[in-house]
């Protein structure tokens, strides 16, 4: 028995040493991040496998279109080691949750995507240019990212208008910054983004509305296994993803606790209600699409930047404390 206890104690000491080494390694990389212009740091730069530095020197729409079309620039959700180190500092407990990890990687999601809204914006803002492009490219069936890129390069009316839209430019420039990323359970990213379903609902305000509904219904124990499951089922259409999401959310005492832990304070009002990205944006039929693009772009970038500030502040405090 004494020998067994000795072995257990030694294993615990070894684990503590491993955790200490991991923490020190995490601190070094995160400290270097904080020494940069961390509020504007583009995490796709951490996933740039091109042979020169031209991608990192890009900005605005040019960089966004390059990210979407270059094979050698990867998705930060699944490729940024820096983002992973930040997650480990802010949420160290997630490393022990099997429903949050895969092959040693904490699952991540880009909260508010650009492309779906940008494509709709092109259709609404440049109908003549879209029509002309489709006539000249009969094999093109819908407004894709490559079509947006080509139109930006070919039509001066498009490029000058986009470049003059300050809120849209700011939204695009903050797309890959810290405040637009969140750890999520296994399967969350693919299910929410619309593979086999619909990217029309791939908006973080809509996602938070359903998550809040889940927490609201969780208070009513007689409804718990029925209606609250349905709220998550609306977000996802795979049983495993639903179960993982419920495990994730059930790890928090309340909606307010969840909001605080994930730095979503700027996405809710003083009463804890989710603030839509634009007036009328909701899960109701016909209301899931953006009605006012200017309002959407302004609110989206403001919330991303505000959350980045909160996360950066929390990182500094955690590093100082440890």
List the predicted regions and their residue ranges.
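Intrinsically disordered, low-complexity N-proximal targeting/linker segments that flank membranes
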Residues: 1-166
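Intrinsic-disorder/low-complexity regions
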Residues: 13, 24-25, 36, 41-47, ...
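Phenylalanine-focused residue identity feature
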Residues: 33, 41-43, 61, 65, ...
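Intrinsically disordered, low-complexity regions enriched in small/polar residues
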Residues: 51, 66, 89, 123-124, ...
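C-terminal substrate/ligand-recognition segments
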Residues: 80, 104-115, 119, 123-127, ...
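Feature representing long, continuous alpha-helical segments
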Residues: 120, 146-149, 153, 160, ...
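Glycine- and acidic-residue-rich phosphate-binding/metal-coordinating active-site segment common to enzymes
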Residues: 164, 169-170, 174, 201
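C-terminal, well-folded lobe of enzymatic/effector domains
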Residues: 193, 198-322
